[in-house]
């Protein structure tokens, strides 16, 4: 094939059809074998005669593939990174569960409506990227087996909920579920003790509240809940002492009041802590007290490029931060969202 020959001349493939480069994701202990067939305008995979058992990185991205044969996946006994983003895939082969060494899977930019249940058998998986698809649900038991998963990115889909087993992904550090149709977040979020970044922005009219457990995410540093329909933040967020970046722009937020929000994270935490210590908040605190962890005071910094409203607005993403009082239209906001601007093959926003 002309494209493959060109890749060989540029050093992407050695004469056996493998690359001798090293992938940044892995420890540079052993030479990795990369088979790069990206950007070759393939509608189907050719017959591969080389030993796929030696391949550790397989890149099939940016083609027109509508399917991947079960037989090919089953031969990838040592693959660590599998990249099939930006194709026309409507499903993944069930044999993907055979990839016991797989650490990074990227299926973004396809036409997937679901992921096979066998994906939970990829117990070494550390990163799962499934953005810009047609996903309406994730496997219910996904989190029960993927104990090594550190990053889950499922933005720009049609998800109404995340699986309840999400709370079992105890190694998770980053969860990106923006631009979906989430009605609520799963129970047991407080179990995600290592979670540092949570993005559930742009679920528009569907997401109306955050669970109390959000305030028990002891490692959380970044939280984006912008462009939803949230009127009040849970009092427990006063306990997020490590939180350094926060955005709630585009919500009809009334608690905390906007004048408190504009004073910065310290003021917002103080307000929510005061609420938690009195009235109904006091009873909630007693119920959750065994799970709370005390930290020393954290002084956050402003995010570069953002406007400081008051001297103590550290960490808040304050650009155009205001209560919309129910005026914001999800259809209008979606016109400006990354779903419309950056989706590889969608010219109109999805409807849930």
From Swiss-Prot:
The entry sums up its family as follows: Belongs to the SHOC2 family.
Renumbered to this chain, region (Disordered) spans 1-25
Which keywords does this Swiss-Prot/TrEMBL entry list?
Leucine-rich repeat, Repeat
Record keywords: Repeat included?
yes
The name this protein goes by in its record:
Plant intracellular Ras-group-related LRR protein 1
Q: What happens when the gene is disrupted?
A: Late flowering.
Matching Pfam families, A to Z?
Answer: LRR_1, LRR_8
Question: InterPro entries, alphabetically?
Answer: Leu-rich_rpt (IPR001611), Leu-rich_rpt_typical-subtyp (IPR003591), LRR_dom_sf (IPR032675), LRR_domain-containing (IPR050216)
Q: In which tissues is it expressed?
A: Widely expressed but at a lower level in seedlings and stems.
LRR repeats mapped onto the chain:
29-52, 53-75, 77-99, 100-122, 124-146, 147-169, 171-192, 195-217, 218-241, 243-263
Single Gene Ontology BP annotation: intracellular signal transduction
Matches recorded under PROSITE patterns: LRR
Main function? Leucine-rich repeat protein that likely mediates protein interactions, possibly in the context of signal transduction.
Short motif (GVYW): ranges = 264-271
């Amino acid at each position: 094939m002309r494209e493959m020959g060109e890749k060989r001349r540029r050093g992407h493939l050695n004469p056996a059809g493998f690359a001798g480069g090293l992938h940044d994701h892995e420890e540079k202990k052993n030479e990795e074998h990369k088979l790069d067939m990206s950007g070759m305008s393939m509608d189907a995979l050719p017959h591969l005669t080389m030993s796929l058992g030696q391949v550790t990185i397989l890149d099939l991205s940016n083609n027109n593939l509508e399917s991947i044969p079960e037989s090919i996946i089953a031969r990838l006994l040592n693959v660590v990174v599998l990249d099939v983003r930006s194709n026309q895939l409507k499903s993944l082969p069930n044999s993907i569960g055979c990839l016991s060494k797989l650490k990074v899977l990227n299926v973004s930019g396809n036409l997937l409506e679901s992921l096979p249940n066998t994906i939970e058998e990829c117990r070494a998986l550390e990163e799962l990227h499934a953005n810009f698809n047609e996903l309406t649900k994730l496997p219910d038991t996904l989190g029960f087996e993927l104990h090594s998963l550190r990053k889950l990115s499922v933005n720009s889909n049609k998800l109404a909920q995340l699986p309840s087993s999400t709370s079992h992904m105890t190694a998770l550090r980053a969860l990106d579920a923006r631009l979906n149709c989430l009605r609520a977040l799963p129970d047991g979020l407080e179990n995600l003790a290592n979670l540092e970044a949570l993005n559930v922005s742009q679920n528009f009219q569907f997401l109306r509240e955050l669970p109390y457990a959000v305030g028990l995410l002891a490692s959380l540093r970044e939280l984006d809940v912008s462009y939803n329909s949230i009127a009040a933040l849970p009092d427990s967020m006063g306990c997020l002492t490590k939180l350094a970046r926060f955005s709630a722009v585009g919500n009809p937020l009334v608690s905390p009041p906007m004048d408190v929000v504009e004073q910065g994270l310290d003021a917002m935490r103080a307000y929510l802590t005061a609420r938690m210590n009195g009235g109904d908040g006091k009873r909630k605190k007693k119920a959750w007290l065994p799970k709370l962890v005390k930290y020393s005071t954290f002084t956050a910094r402003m995010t570069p490029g953002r406007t400081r409203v008051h001297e103590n607005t550290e960490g808040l993403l304050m650009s155009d931060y205001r209560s919309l009082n129910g005026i914001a239209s999800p259809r209008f906001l979606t016109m400006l969202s990354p779903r419309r601007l950056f989706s590889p093959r969608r010219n109109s926003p999805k409807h849930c």
